[in-house]
Amino acid sequence: MNGPQHPLTGIRVLEMGSRVAAPYVGKLLADAGADVCKVESPAGDPFRRWSASGATIPMGGDAAWFRFLNGGKRSAVVDLGVDGGRDELLHLVAGADLVIDDHDPADARALGITADDLRAVNPAVVVATLTPFGTTGPWADRPANDFVLQALVGSTEVRGMPGEEPVSVGGDLGDFTAAAFAAPAALSATLAARASGHGAHVDCSQYEAMMHSFQVFRPMYESMAPDYEFPRQFMIPSIEPASDGMVALCCVTGQQWQDFCAMIGAPEFGDDPMFLSFIGRLERKEEVWERIHAFTKAHTVDEIVEVASAFRIPCGPVGDGLTLPGYDHFVERGVFVDHPQGFIGPRPSIGFSESTLAPRRPAPSLGDAGDEPDDGPGPVLGTDPARPLAGVRILDLGTFWAGPVAASFLRVLGADLVKVESHVRLDGMRWAAGYQRDHLWEWSPGYHGANPGKTLVTLDLTTDAGQEVLGTLLDTADVVIENFSPRVMDSWGVTWDAVRRRNPRAVYLRAPAFGLDGPWRDRVGFAMTMEQVGGLANRTGHPDGPRLLPQGPVDMFAAMHAAVAVLLALADRERTGTGQLIEAPLIEAALQASAEQVVEASAYGNVLGCLGNRSAAATPQGLYRTAEDDRWLAVSIETDAQWANLQGLVDGLDDLDRHGDADRIDEVLGAWSRGQAGRESEERLWQAGVPAAFCVHPNHSGGTAQHEFRGFLQWYEHPVTGSTPYFSYPFLVDGARLSLGGPAPTLGQHTDQVLESLGLDEAAIARLREQGVTDDWPVGIPRP
C-alpha cells in the first residue's frame, strides 16, 4: 500500500454521472479516501462548462463548480455511441467495488448498461442507480427534474402567500438530497459486498428521497386527521429587517414564541393561543409584523442575535455567497478552505477524532485517469448488503429530526437500537401534530416518521438513577447518537471522554446545530435556522419578494451525512479495534448544499440570489395557473428535444426562442394552462415527453401509482393511531424494500423490556417508577 490511510482507502468507485447528484455521491466517497474514477463522454460532463451566475469559463478550463464537485477524482473517457465503447466500460466495471450511475432507465436499457448488465460482468460489484423515480414502476421512464419533483411531493404547493403564486426551492437542493440518501445506502452495501463477494443493485429514487425531505411525512394526516390540511404559508418570524440588514429568527416551540414575544416587548402576543401556530400568525400577519419590525428595525443584526441567543431563540445572520466565509464562527472553526484550483468552498461536513479524510485535491481534466492507486485490501463491514449492520447496537439519545433520523436509517440497515427519551421533557417532535387530540404526544407525523420500529425506554437523566441506567446502556453500545446543543450532553456527563472511558469501542456521533466549539457553540438552531444562516433561503423566493425557507430538508440532509460518518467510523473500527468521536454539525451539512454560492462568489465575484420559479439551467420553467382555483402546473424544459415536444403540444410556441423569449413563452403557457385541469394537463405533458407536474398538497402526495408499485408506504398498526403509513427509505436493494420493523413507539412502551434486559428485576423497575425516574406518561399532564 502507498500513501496515507483514509477510511475508504482501497475502495474503487466508478462514477457514471453528471451535474450534481451522482457527482456529489462520488465526492463524499472521494473525500473519505475512495479511488473515484469519473466516466465521461468525449464531450465531458456538461458541468465542466456550467456557471449558475453566467460567468464565462475560459476555453480549455473547467468551471469552478465542476471542480468543487469533482475534486480528487480521476477521469476516463468512454464513448458509448461507438463500437467497442460498451466493452471499454465493462472492463472498468470489472475492477470496481461500486458503480454510481445516473443514466435514465430507458437510456441504460438501450445502451446495454443496466444494473443487471454490469453485474453480469462483476457479480461482486454494487451498482447504485440514482434516477428521478427509480428504475421500476409506471413512472420510471417519465422525464422529471428537481423542480418537477418538488411539485409532485407537495413542497411547492404550500410555500408562499395564500392565493398568490407559490414558489419552489432554488439551488438544486433536491439533487443534493437524493445524493445524500444514496451515499450511505451505496456505501453500506459496498462494505458488506466486499466481505461476502456478493454485490447488489441499490435502486435509489430522487422522488422518494424528496418525499422524506421536502415535507414532514404529510400523507400520515390522511389516516390520522383527514380534515386537517394546512394552507400555503411561510414562517413568522423568519427573515426580518434589522437597522443594518436582515436577521434570521425562528420560533418552532411554544416556549420559543413566548420568549420571542417577551424579547420584542409584545408579551400579550405570547399569551394569545391564536399566535402559537404558524397559521395563526399568518392569518394576522400585518399586525404581527408591525410589532416584530418595531423591534427589529430599531436594532442591528448583531444586537438582535445577542439578545435572542440569551433567550435561547434560534437566530443568526442571513448568509449568502459573499458573507458566509467571513462569519466569525466559520472563520474560527476553519469551515471554508482554499481549493487547489483557485477558489474557496466548505470543508466536508463531518469530522473525526481518529480517522483522517483525504486532503483537498484538484478535479481531473477530461480523460486524466492518472495512476491507479495500489491501496491494498480496503475496509469491510458486515456481510449482507441489505443488512450490513446486523449485530451493531445503537443508543439513540437524539431529539426532533436529524439525530433520530440518522439512528433510524442505521437501524433499518440491520442494527439493534434503543431510544432513550425523557418523560419529563419529551422529544419535541411529539408536539408537532398541529391539531388537537387526546394523547396528543402520540399523534405527530414528524415523530412517527423519524422513529419507526424503535425500542423506547423513558429515563429522567437529571437523576442519579437515570444516569446509572444510561451508563449501563453506554457500556454495550457500538454507536451513540445525539443532536442536542453541546451544553445538554455536558450537563448529563455524556462527554466524549466519559463515553470513551466506559466503552473504548463506542462510536459517538454528536450533531449539534453549530458544532462543539466556536462562538456559536451554544446557540440553538433548527433546520430552518440553517436554511436562513447557511444561504439556502437566499436562493428561495420571488426576486421581488421576501426570502422564503425550504422548511426542513436540511435535517434529512444532515442525518444522511451523519449516517455516512458512522459507517466510516465502524469500518475503521474493524481495522483499529477502537471507536471515536464524530462531529457532524447541522450547519456544515447545509453549507454543502449552498456551496455553489460561495464557489461562484470566490471564483467569479458573482452573488447568486432568487430566481423565483425560473432557472438558469432550464428554460422555460415556471408555475402556471390551471382551470382549478389557485392550483398550479409546474413545467421545466432542460433540452431542445423537450422543447420540441412542448411545441408539438401547445399552440403558439413554434416561432419563439426558448432562451430569448421567456416572458412571451410564459404568456402562451399561462393561457394554455388556464384552460386545463391540472391532472389532465400533467398527463398530457408527460405522455408528450415534457417534464411537468400538477402541484399537489403534501397531505395527498402518498397515493400515487409509482409509490404503490414500489411499496413506498409501509403500513403498521400503532397502539394509539391505528393503521398508519410510514415512508420507506428511498431505495430498493435487489428489488426489495428494507423493512422499517414496526410503528413508532408510544411513550415508555418498551421500558420494562429494556430494563429487564439490563438485569433489573420487577421490584427494581417499580422503584424507578415510584421515584419518577421512568414513566409512560408525560410529567405535568394529568392522567385521565
How should each PLM-predicted stretch be described?
Residues 1-198, 221-222, 291, 302, ...:
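N-terminal helix-loop segment corresponding to the beta1-alpha1 unit
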Residues 43, 132-134, 206-211, 244, ...:
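Glycine-rich beta-alpha junction loops
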Residues 166-177, 201, 231-237, 246-248, ...:
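A short glycine-threonine-serine/GTX helix/turn-capping micro-motif
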Residues 189-228, 317, 321, 569-612, ...:
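Substrate-binding/catalytic subdomain of NAD(P)-dependent oxidoreductase enzymes
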Residues 235-311, 315, 620-688, 692:
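Aromatic-enriched alpha-helical interface/lid elements that frame and gate functional surfaces
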Residues 271-281, 319-328, 343, 656-669, ...:
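Short linear loop/turn motifs
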Residues 305, 310-360, 687-741, 780:
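A glycine-rich dinucleotide-binding beta-alpha-beta segment and adjacent secondary-structure elements
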